[in-house]
């Protein structure tokens, strides 16, 4: 299963993440406490042996162009209502791999209806990967009855409040293509190798679980 460990800030964190994850991410141009500058991000992109996603809440093409040109990454993670025309321009101009986030409510009165609306939204976009999240890196879990329905139709990456203690059960229920974690594997605002190791072990247990 694809495992992305997001929100790295230092070469030391990158080194840990590379030992366990398939991809990582740097937070740029948003209000997150994990936000770093372009120079730091460029250094991490250059050092990395795995894909480094530039993560941002911007919907402005000019800002994405800055991110691409100043960091050198070819991987973008978009947490905004950016339109398809802008995405097409970025893909045609820069050839980037784009993962687009779609917001899932924390609790649903009607999971089937909510899933249907989100599926319709997803189908209005053409992107390389779909991310289901509770909303802009808030660190809260969402209603996994919805993501379970969506995961039967699309290859999705699951995010939102994942940690070593809950990821086994969530992966087992939702059966996503991949998972994306940040705060759930941190201790004192830094990536913790023991938490990352346990998280990845439990992802694999959930993936291989047979009813």
UniProtKB/Swiss-Prot annotation:
Enzyme class: isomerase
Name of this chain's protein: N-(5'-phosphoribosyl)anthranilate isomerase
GO molecular function: phosphoribosylanthranilate isomerase activity
Keyword Cytoplasm among UniProt keywords: no
Listed HAMAP family: PRAI (MF_00135)
Keywords assigned by UniProt, alphabetized: Amino-acid biosynthesis, Aromatic amino acid biosynthesis, Isomerase, Tryptophan biosynthesis
Matches recorded under PANTHER family: N-(5'-PHOSPHORIBOSYL)ANTHRANILATE ISOMERASE
UniProt source species: Methanococcus maripaludis (strain C6 / ATCC BAA-1332)
Family annotation (InterPro entries): Aldolase_TIM, PRAI_dom, RibuloseP-bd_barrel, TrpF_fam
Phylogenetic placement of the source organism: Archaea, Methanobacteriati, Methanobacteriota, Methanomada group, Methanococci
